């Protein structure tokens, strides 16, 4: 049995077309959705991510603003800029590209963003509200994974789900969203004693640790859904995920590729969060 491929590019295209329609409707009413992206320092990977986010905005009728600063920018100056953007009615989403230089406290920076403009869903107000199932914004990567389950009719209620990884950006919110959807959730991580014992019982496995081949074919229950959030490089320098794709695809029922799986969905859900913010602002105007 070869797994069915969950194509993130195709689903992204559909969702971005819907976002573009919503953006056009808002713009016609004088409320063009706006996203501000802040980049501090010259991290090549961050520059690529920011470029992709800005392009996605431009391609879908959003207003976008990119602030690029040298790595020497002071924390106080960054916080002052965020305060300006919080008060700018043209901006509905504020995103600070992580990681930040060592002298800047990323927690303080995230908490400085107004919760109603926190389109990454990292602010403590949104992270806390995720516990009750009522956040203003859901973090983009796990939100995109949930859309993948929905698009393919993958049943979550009563399913055994294993999330490998416990980051605030993916692992923890992913577990909360799966729990909210009625799954029985286990969170595994680097200190888990016998990872395979957990994954072999799972109907759904989400791998999000940033470590190649953390999940191999012998660790997967036949017919399981495997979502690969990892972004790594193989020995030849090619992009790969956390999952041994060649092996696991022969056992799983559904699998996401890397690239072309979860990656495109992350930026798509950023657009969806920004449009929702703009719609709320327009309704309150």
From Swiss-Prot:
Protein keywords: Amino-acid biosynthesis, Histidine biosynthesis, Hydrolase, Methionine biosynthesis, Multifunctional enzyme, NADP, One-carbon metabolism, Oxidoreductase, Purine biosynthesis
Organism superkingdom: Bacteria
A GO-annotated cellular component: cytosol
BP terms from Gene Ontology: L-histidine biosynthetic process; methionine biosynthetic process; purine nucleotide biosynthetic process; tetrahydrofolate interconversion
Keyword Hydrolase set for record: yes
Record flagged with keyword Amino-acid biosynthesis: yes
Pathways involved: One-carbon metabolism; tetrahydrofolate interconversion
Binding residues annotated for NADP(+), in chain numbering: 165-167, 190
SUPFAM superfamilies: Aminoacid dehydrogenase-like, N-terminal domain, NAD(P)-binding Rossmann-fold domains
EC numbers for this chain: 1.5.1.5, 3.5.4.9
Pfam family, one: THF_DHG_CYH
UniProt GO molecular function: methenyltetrahydrofolate cyclohydrolase activity; methylenetetrahydrofolate dehydrogenase (NADP+) activity
Catalysis performed (reactions): (6R)-5,10-methylene-5,6,7,8-tetrahydrofolate + NADP(+) = (6R)-5,10-methenyltetrahydrofolate + NADPH; (6R)-5,10-methenyltetrahydrofolate + H2O = (6R)-10-formyltetrahydrofolate + H(+)
UniProt similarity note: Belongs to the tetrahydrofolate dehydrogenase/cyclohydrolase family.
Assembly, per entry: Homodimer.
Function: Catalyzes the oxidation of 5,10-methylenetetrahydrofolate to 5,10-methenyltetrahydrofolate and then the hydrolysis of 5,10-methenyltetrahydrofolate to 10-formyltetrahydrofolate.
Name assigned to this protein: Bifunctional protein FolD
Protein species of origin: Burkholderia cenocepacia (strain HI2424)
